[in-house]
Amino acid sequence: MKFLHFIFAASIGIYSLSTLQAADLMSIYQEALAQDAQYRSARAAYQAAQEKLVQGRAGFLPTITLSGSRTVQQVDANNVFTGVGNINPQEVTIHGRGAVLSATQPIFRMENIVIYQQSKTEVSRADAQFIVAGQDLILRVAQAYFDVLDAQVDVEVAEAQKKAILKQLEQAKRNFEVGVSTIVDTNEAQARYDLTTSQEIAARNALEIRKRMLQGIIDRLPENLAGAREIASNLTSLRYGSMDEWVRTAEEKNFALKIQQAAYEIAAQEVKKVWSQHYPTVDLVAQYSDQTGVGGAITGRGIDLISKSIGVQLNVPLFQGFSVQSRVREALAHQNRALHDLESTRRSIALQARQQFLNVTNGIAQVKALKQALLSSKSQLDSTILGQEVGVRTEVDVLNAQQQMYSARRDLAKAYHSYLMSRLRLSAEAGELDEEVLKEINALLLL
């Protein structure tokens, strides 16, 4: 029975060791918020897009320009003032200075109105894109986290199997030495031990690769991650009960769909913007000009010329070589493409929502079945060990039962992680994935 106690202790240690002083999913996510280069790039793009509204509003504001000039001119006085006798000096230098202040206030420019409407839509699209980037970060962090947990389970199972098989190998050798078993039992145990050693090496290599992938997100190598101490008993607490409810929610709230809707609106506004070049423009224009220093050395007097003007300027486009008509047709084609892209995105999101809902519901059933399979495999191992002690089971039977129990434990852990990941993806498709949802998933890991 000591061997049986060793098996149970090793199987319990698979989870207890992995959660000792380990980082949980939320702490890894908080690190990713600060360190992930892809998310920081999305944040910079979001900040840049906010300036679109300022740029669009600028079309309603006046433009003011100030220009100045300073000139020096050499004049042949005899050529300029013919018939007045000799002029001294023969060449005259004329100095001039000037300044012009002008302002234009748009009164009606249809193109500027459409540009402003476009800028608001572009900001809305940027908002949705940044939210999608945040949801994508949650999914990438969770997937990398669960990948590491899966790899940890593989390593821990391989270690436990190796220890148990080593124990069995040592027992088989002792039995052979005292003559109560054949060399076949020893060879069988040795073959199993060699196989598990190879599997342990492969599992450790896979774990290192998975950790490096998570390192690419949080910019440090994770040492130890918290896994589930036990499987949650309540796996059915979904916000919506039916698949159709999830699909309707996804079609209303999904942010990838909102991005595509904004793209269609921008394309439609582009048609209006191009067509607006047929419209006249009306501007209020004003100018102040001050020119000094004209004349000077010849007449003995300086001239200071000041002019002021204000008025309304009307520009009516009459003919632009059919370029506007061509660009309108081009914009209409882009609008039509955006409409088809929108419908394609809508169908894809509905499909993804259905798939993730099925993954969640099937995952619940799979986890429950694997929990029962684990209990059954433990009972089978108990019976096999007892059978070996009374002589009705062999060493190979014990090894097979042990292998089946470890496989059931590994499959259960991976199915549970897959179920949790499907819940996150389902929330993302419904447009509801945020930190609160991630906290709920993290709580299911820390039971």
Indicate residue ranges for each PLM-predicted region:
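Periplasmic alpha-helical coiled-coil/stalk elements that build and connect Gram-negative outer-membrane
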Residues: 136-249, 359, 363, 367, ...
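Bacterial Sec-pathway N-terminal export signals of envelope proteins
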Residues: 20-69, 75, 105, 222, ...
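Amphipathic alpha-helical coiled-coil segments
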Residues: 41-56, 133, 137-156, 167, ...
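Bacterial N-terminal signal peptides
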Residues: 5-16
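Metallo-beta-lactamase
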Residues: 203, 255, 415
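Acidic, low-complexity, intrinsically disordered peripheral segments
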Residues: 74, 411-447
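Small/polar, glycine/serine/threonine/aspartate-rich low-complexity segments that form flexible
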Residues: 67-105, 230-239, 272, 285-320, ...
